[in-house]
Regions:
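Short amphipathic alpha-helical segments enriched in hydrophobics
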Residues: 12, 16, 31, 35, ...
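Interhelical loop and helix-boundary elements at the membrane-water interface
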Residues: 1-27, 60-92, 120-154
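A short, conserved beta-to-alpha structural element at the edge of catalytic cores
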Residues: 117, 121-129, 159, 166-174
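Helix-coil boundary and interhelical linker segments in multi-pass alpha-helical membrane proteins
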Residues: 34-50, 92-111, 160-174
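Short Lys/Arg-rich amphipathic alpha-helical segments
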Residues: 17-36, 49-57
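Membrane-embedded alpha-helical segments that form the functional core of polytopic membrane enzymes
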Residues: 43-64, 72, 106-119
């Protein structure tokens, strides 16, 4: 497998972390979303970037996941964290990010990012159905699909808490 493919599947090498590689692999989308929110980027642009991450890392998993399993000698190897990047990016999509110039917006954005991260890690580790049964799919799909499902679960929970319970809405940026 080429260096580029390995770099992509391990999220720049984060998948080689000695412990909690999935947690480390989940961090890049969180950092990108928070940076964009704190810089006042519009919600649509943050969502677009997150969906592009979902697309790029999903394609990488499906296309090169089988090669990675052969290289690392096991199904869904821990070094492959492109699935975590995709799932975490999905969990960060469509959130009610707020303009940082508005009072309290920085806290709202920080809580959204941290909440989405914790919710995704919780569901990714717990693997509630149907995510648990989808891990049995072959190759890259087996690596990816459970993380997309847990990313969707995290997104729903964060949306319900943020919009439903806390009444947060997107505050226009720019």
């Amino acid at each position: 497998m080429s260096r580029f493919r390995t770099f992509l599947l391990t999220a720049g090498g984060l998948g080689h972390a000695p412990v909690a590689s999935g947690t480390f692999g989940s961090l890049p989308p969180v950092a990108i979303a928070l940076l964009m929110a704190f810089l006042g980027q519009p919600v649509w642009l943050i969502t677009l970037v997150m969906l592009l991450l979902v697309a790029v890392f999903s394609v990488a998993c499906v296309r090169f996941g089988g090669e990675a399993e052969a290289l690392f000698g096991r199904k869904d190897p821990g070094q492959v964290v492109a699935d975590e990047v995709a799932g975490q990016a999905l969990a960060l999509s469509f959130l009610p990010w707020a303009d940082p110039s508005i009072s309290g917006a920085a806290w709202q954005n920080l809580l959204l990012g941290v909440g989405a991260f914790l919710a995704f890690r919780f569901f990714d580790i717990l693997k509630p159905p149907p995510a648990s049964s989808l891990e049995s799919l072959k190759g890259g799909l087996g690596i990816l699909v459970d993380d997309l499902i847990t990313g969707l679960m995290a997104l729903v929970v964060v949306q319900v808490v943020a919009r439903g319970l806390l009444g947060w809405q997107s505050i226009p940026m720019g």
